[in-house]
C-alpha cells in the first residue's frame, strides 16, 4: 500500500511534495513504536527529529504553489504505510526479511496488473522504459532489503530518521537533466534540505560517540 500510494502521489504532484510527505515518517514511526513496541525515544533522537522538522516546514512553505490535494493525500498515506512497515519489522524480528519484501513486491505486481487491465493499457513498453523499469525495480528491492536488515539492530524511530536521506537524494535526482525531468528545487527546498542533512549528521555523530543505541533507555 505504501509503495502504490507513493507512485500515485508522485504522479499527481511534484517530487518535492511527495518526498516532504515521506519526511514525516519519523514522527509517525516514533508514535507507533511508542504505542505498540514500547520503545522510548531518547532526547538526542528527538533533537534530530526537531531539526528535521524545521527543514520540512521550510521546504513546505517553498512548494505550496505546486501542491496537489490528491498527491498530498497519497503522500501522507505512503508515509504512514512505510512507518507501519518499519514498526512491524521491529515487532517480529524473527520474520524472514527477504520473504516480506518478496511478498510486498508480488502484491504491487498484482495491483499494477489489475490497474493496467482495467484501464485497457498495454503491458509492453519501449526498450528504454523497460530498462528504466528494471533499474527501478532492482534499486528499490535492494534498498528495501538493506532497510529490512538494518531494522534488526536499529530502533524504528531511528530507522526512519536515517531514511530522510531519501528526501535529499530524491529532490537532487529529479533535478539532474540526465533523466529528462529537470525539476529545479526552490531556494526553500535547498535550505530545508540542509536542515535535514544537519539532523542526519547530528544523529550519526551521536551514534558514533555512543557505543550502545541511545534510543533504547
Report each predicted region and the residues it spans.
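Transmembrane alpha-helical segments that form core, pore/gating elements
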Residues: 29-30, 64-120, 133, 146, ...
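Hydrophobic/small/kink-forming positions within alpha-helical transmembrane segments
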Residues: 1-4, 26-31, 57, 80-83, ...
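Specific transmembrane alpha-helical segments of multi-pass solute transporters/efflux pumps
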Residues: 1-17, 22, 56-58, 134, ...
